Swiss-Prot record:
Source organism superkingdom: Eukaryota
Low complexity compositional bias, start-end: 22-39, 129-164, 180-189, 204-216
Biased composition (Gly residues): 165-179
Name by which UniProt lists this protein: FERM domain-containing protein B
GO terms classed as biological process: regulation of cell-substrate adhesion; regulation of sorocarp development
Region of interest (Disordered), ranges: 19-39, 129-196, 202-221
PROSITE patterns the record matches: FERM_3
InterPro entries: Band_41_domain (IPR019749), FERM/acyl-CoA-bd_prot_sf (IPR014352), FERM_2 (IPR035963), FERM_central (IPR019748), FERM_domain (IPR000299), KRIT1/FRMD8 (IPR051594), PH-like_dom_sf (IPR011993), Ubiquitin-like_domsf (IPR029071)
GO CC annotations, alphabetized: cytoskeleton; cytosol; plasma membrane
Residues in FERM domain copies: 48-468
Length: 478
């Protein structure tokens, strides 16, 4: 594996280099505004250099024609460059990301269309201050429609994806069709360049590809690190980066079946990101174990000079919800001895050990959305959460996490009665108890990404229901 894909970043990778470099001024009008032009005979007239990032901020540089390179083709190029085979590569795809939100690219949309539509998507889903819901927010599932499960629209788009029109599943509808219930109105028209499902689509025929609608319905995740754009020469239009990382609907059994070094590394750095950013909140003893593994993988066997490195880079090793509880010297005294015990350990085995620890958590592999909890009543003492929380969605169910308080609540898909979304909120109702003797419990959240949460739950619900049917069928055969 090339050094730029390793956890340690080279000096060159930390520079604010030009990352999108038109080779001739007669290139794409939307991509040729840069005053910096690199002369290289190896690039075609319409080729540009872009950086594909990984979750740990390392990157690979590729040459593409943005007007004729699709998300699917870019995914294939990166997978090949990393040496990830066809089976393993199905677990990954390319995301468009800024510091507030991430979007899974649409398979067949050109990269130039992704750039063109990024501003629209950002405006729609990153505006967190306007139209804030109050605790009295009305929602269909809180108004007597508790028997309805929320679902994406199943309507097939017949519009051309290139014109950005249509109202297919990408429109982010709330409760499903077939329920006879209207949902909050979605903005008219799809948005080109972004995938409508939380997983990578199977290959489609050209006829189907030309009919797909186009709004991402998957990922929202805040990032503490400063954004490094894949297209800095485009100014505001290109203030996002392309990131190659796992898809959002990835069954844990499938992930565990993959053991190649390249794929394992991608899962490993994704887990580190979620641990350090407290998306995976853990107790101190577990955090120390994970930090020691990370340190051994990064710097090798313990040496005196590593102690200074650890203190200077402590925020890369200790989860954010624990960091302020001790001084850097105290963390050093706790981590370094455990690091010493790992002397001579194989890096790949350590990465797998790190993943195995994280995979025990119910919320492992979740897609996380930042939200504000809106209490259903005004009593301070009966409020389950206070203010900002993370909503996690994975194959196990729906998770509400407050890492500062180390408080987590999880519900399986069989517990979900209904869910609904608006442009600025998300509401979900669960059943508490067994059989006919159960109570209902609603949660209301302020978030501009309610439609995305809605659709991702739909994707995972379908996955869960399919698995349940298979298990029931297998049990009847016995």
């Amino acid at each position: 594996m090339e050094s730029s894909f390793e956890a340690s970043k080279s000096l060159n990778e930390n520079r604010d280099d030009i990352e999108l470099i038109p080779t001739q001024s007669q290139g794409s009008p939307s991509l040729s505004s840069s005053s910096t032009i690199t002369s290289t005979s190896r690039l075609g007239s319409n080729q540009v250099l872009i950086r594909i990032y990984f979750i740990d901020d390392t990157h690979k540089t590729l040459s593409i024609d943005p007007n004729n390179t699709t998300g699917d083709q870019l995914w294939e190029m990166v997978s090949e460059k990393l040496g990830i085979n066809n089976r393993d590569s199905e677990c990954f795809f390319v995301w468009a990301q800024n510091d507030e939100i991430e979007w899974l690219l649409f398979n067949h949309q050109n990269i130039s269309e992704v750039i063109k539509n990024w501003g629209i998507l950002k405006k729609r889903y990153c505006n967190t201050e306007e139209n804030s819901p109050s605790s009295s927010t009305s929602s269909p599932i809180l108004s007597g429609l508790s028997s309805i499960r929320g679902k994406k629209s199943n309507a097939s788009s017949t519009s051309n994806a290139n014109d950005g029109s249509g109202s297919g599943s990408g429109s982010g509808s709330g409760s499903g069709s077939g329920s006879g219930t209207s949902t909050p109105n979605s903005p008219k028209g799809g948005l080109s360049g972004f995938l409508t499902l939380g997983r990578k689509n199977k290959a489609q025929s050209p006829q189907l590809q030309s009919q797909s609608s186009s709004l991402s319905t998957t990922i929202a995740s805040e990032h503490a690190s400063k954004l490094r754009s894949s297209f800095p020469t485009l100014g505001e239009e290109g203030q996002f980066r392309l990131v190659y990382r796992p898809t959002s609907v990835l069954p844990l059994e499938l992930e565990r079946s993959i053991n190649t070094a390249e794929a394992t590394h991608l899962f490993y750095i994704q887990a580190i990101h979620n641990v350090i950013n407290s998306n995976y909140p853990c107790e101190e003893d577990v955090a120390l174990k994970l930090a020691s593994i990370q340190l051994q993988v990064l710097v090798g066997d313990q040496k005196m000079e590593h102690q200074d490195h650890f203190k200077e880079s402590i925020s890369r090793y200790i989860p954010s919800h624990l960091l302020s509880k001790r001084k850097a010297e105290e963390w050093e005294q706790l981590v370094i001895p455990q690091h010493s015990l790992l002397r001579g350990s194989d890096s790949l085995q350590l990465k797998r050990a790190y993943l195995e620890t994280c995979q025990r958590w119910a919320y492992y592999g979740s897609t996380f959305f930042k939200a504000k909890y809106i209490p259903a009543n005004t009593s301070f003492f009966t409020q389950e959460f206070q203010g900002k929380v993370s909503i996690g969605i994975n194959g196990n169910g729906f998770h509400i996490i407050d890492p500062k308080e180390m408080k987590m609540v999880s519900y399986s898909y069989r517990d979900i009665i209904a869910w609904d979304s608006t442009s600025n909120s998300f509401t979900i109702k669960f059943k508490i108890g067994q059989d006919k003797k159960f109570e209902t419990k609603p949660y209301i959240f302020k978030t501009p990404q309610g439609e995305l949460i809605n659709d991702l739950i739909s994707d995972w619900s379908e996955e869960w229901e399919s698995k349940e049917k298979k298990n029931n069928k297998d049990s009847k055969k016995k």
